Amino acid sequence: MLFRSNPEAAAEVTRAVKAVTTKPVIIKLSPNVTDIVSIAKACEDAGADGISLINTLLGMRINLRTRKPVIANKMGGFSGPAIFPVAVRMVYQVANAVKIPVVGMGGVSSAEDVIEMMLAGATAVEVGAANLVNPYICRDIIRDLPEVMAKYRIENLSEIIGGVK
């Protein structure tokens, strides 16, 4: 079942998980869809406690010498700073459509990125691929946040969540 692109299937999976746990259920959404908002709303209606987005974009590379795909599956997950604008857009769209918390991720690699995600509507921000480049990236972001907040006259991060309408 390809529940990533079908609102009804995503709702069904959400309900099934909610039925077997009392813990909060946060649904991670794929960006490889035409309408992420309808999927997020279906998950919310099915009882999701939060939405997390985005996962990797589908990508592909071809070896010029062999003229074959670089990876055996032909396509795979594309992540890192290049997907950040896509992630910000989708966080903005979903945060403006649901009432549950939204966790933003996808290409986050700086304190500025954290603030941008929160302005788009993220109530929390995750760092993924940047950890592979710099295992201390989370420490660095936390260290840099006060200075960046001061630069943009932000006293408390909670005041900027969803600040862009």
Model regions: which residues?
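Histidine/lysine/aspartate-rich catalytic loop segments that bind and position anionic ligands
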Residues: 54-78
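Alpha/beta catalytic cores of nucleotide-metabolism and tRNA/nucleoside-modifying enzymes
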Residues: 78-99, 103, 109-165
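Short, small-residue-biased leader/transition segments that mark boundaries at the very start
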Residues: 1-2
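Non-catalytic positions within long, well-ordered alpha-helices that form the structural scaffold/packing
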Residues: 18, 44-47, 118
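Short beta-strand/loop segments at the ligand-binding rim of alpha/beta enzyme cores
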Residues: 20-31, 96-105
